[in-house]
Amino acid sequence: MKMIKTICGAVILSVGFIACSKSGTPGDPADTGPYQLSYGDSILYLRPSSGDYIVSPLKHREGVYSGFPEGIEIDGVTGAINVSNSETGLRYRITHISPKGDTTKTTVVLSGITFTDHFYILSAGDSVANPVYNAHPNRVLPLAGSVFDEGNLANGGGCSVKTDNGKINLAESIRRGVFGHTPDNDDKKEIEIKYRINDGSGKSLNKLKVLLYWYNTMADVPQYVWDILSDRSSQGVFLRGSSVEEAAQASRIEQAAKPRPPCVIIVDH
């Protein structure tokens, strides 16, 4: 009787060992079915960290990972996104291509603010650039407890950034001499805005560079500026909804898209 119990126990242990060993093996159907590429959430926030904050796919597959547009730092082998070293405030398309050539895509937003590429006509009263939060103009930017232009880099350089809401007063910036005493056509000024948002980031320090342009009239805007805006439009809008996916479905060859820095183009009249 004792021997029978011993044999039964050995059989049970063997079955249990086989079951445990099978889980997660390369031959598991769960690892060979359609790949569900996901990072756990569609919006990834910076987190307080002693080093770089990195987010990996919930499930890894062999193959090559890539991100579009330019600005996201992604490991091509593991798919891990270095949020700390990426341009935030934008929507990115992540693509995985398996060794067999199967393609899987998903989109993620790296939380933060940006500004739209836009002509601001001062004589028409269009003089305030509003920040866009989490890649969608309709998302409400949480202001309570948030701070913008930490360190006073932008305001100290003549760019009037409201510290409580991140808005840029362009007319006031001109009066403060952001382009000098008298701006000239094609004057440019790159500013950096450091900020902390009271959201899922836990007020982690974030930053954004914005490129300001000055022109007396629309007729003075040179062709290269129009080309920049045209390229960004044709390569996909990196803000509203699923437009990146829609752009990807177009029958064209994608080139490297550079959505940063946003172009704030100030025109006098």
Regions found by a protein language model. Name each.
Residues 21-66, 109-161, 203, 210-269:
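Solvent-exposed, low-complexity, repeat-rich "mucin-like" stalks and linkers
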Residues 74-129:
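Intrinsically disordered, glycine/charged-rich N-terminal periplasmic/extracytoplasmic linker segments
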Residues 64-82, 146-180:
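Low-complexity "stalk/linker" and mucin-like segments enriched in Ser/Thr/Pro/Ala/Gly
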Residues 1-8:
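Bacterial N-terminal signal peptides that target proteins for export
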Residues 11-14:
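Alpha-helical transmembrane segments
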Residues 87-102, 106, 177-199, 208-210:
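A short beta-strand micro-motif common to beta-rich folds, especially ectodomain repeats
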Residues 16-19:
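C-terminal motif of bacterial Sec signal peptides marking the signal peptidase cleavage site
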Residues 24, 69, 85-87:
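Disulfide-rich extracellular repeat modules and their boundaries
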